[in-house]
């Protein structure tokens, strides 16, 4: 059935501690995606409802400066390239505080997207409400939703950020393959590996 966004969006919670350690993360596997509407580097606003007809939507909390993100960026581009024809849409969201980390400003996001030839929307979560509502803690951090907007996988892209030739388990690709084939992923959650989101 088509995705119908909830009538309310959870408001931001001040983030000074690890919310997951307190059991306060908003989204759990099986939960419905929370709606958002964010500006992209392409000059358009993007809402989750825009992609309601997709087989799967991959939301990745990302940024410009984190070395973990930079190590995985090319793989993010390749995943979108390989799965676009199968009805998959990747969305990257930058929620970092640009006042403290100017490299994550919206103009710098535009430069990075152009430099790396991003083939997916790169969105700015200036208020940090989306990251807070999703319970995101790291960059990159993956939230994979099926065509009913249920969370089916959360965690890392694969098991080796440092060397893509040494990857043994492609968690995100495996989860996508499962959803596309009509089954649930064997692995539904892994521990996110990356930089902390830079909260205001």
PLM features: residue spans?
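Chalcogenol-based redox active-site neighborhoods
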Residues: 2-189, 196-200
């Amino acid at each position: 059935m088509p995705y119908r966004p909830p009538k309310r969006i959870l408001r931001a919670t001040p983030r000074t501690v690890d919310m997951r350690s307190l059991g306060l993360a908003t989204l759990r596997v099986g939960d419905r995606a929370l709606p958002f509407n964010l500006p992209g580097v392409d000059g358009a606003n993007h809402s989750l409802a825009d992609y309601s007809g997709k087989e799967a939507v991959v939301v990745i909390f990302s940024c410009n400066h984190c070395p973990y993100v930079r190590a995985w960026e090319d793989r993010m581009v390749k995943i979108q390239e390989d799965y676009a024809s199968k009805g998959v849409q990747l969305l990257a969201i930058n929620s970092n505080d640009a006042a403290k980390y100017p490299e994550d400003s919206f103009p710098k996001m535009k430069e990075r997207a152009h430099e790396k030839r991003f083939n997916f929307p790169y969105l700015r979560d200036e208020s940090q409400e989306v990251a807070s509502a999703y319970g995101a803690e790291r960059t990159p951090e993956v939230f994979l939703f099926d065509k009913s907007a249920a969370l089916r996988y959360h965690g890392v892209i694969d098991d080796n950020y440092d060397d893509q030739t040494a990857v043994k388990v492609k968690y995100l690709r495996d989860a996508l393959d499962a959803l596309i084939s009509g089954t649930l992923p064997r692995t539904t959650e892994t521990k996110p590996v990356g930089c902390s989101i830079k909260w205001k």
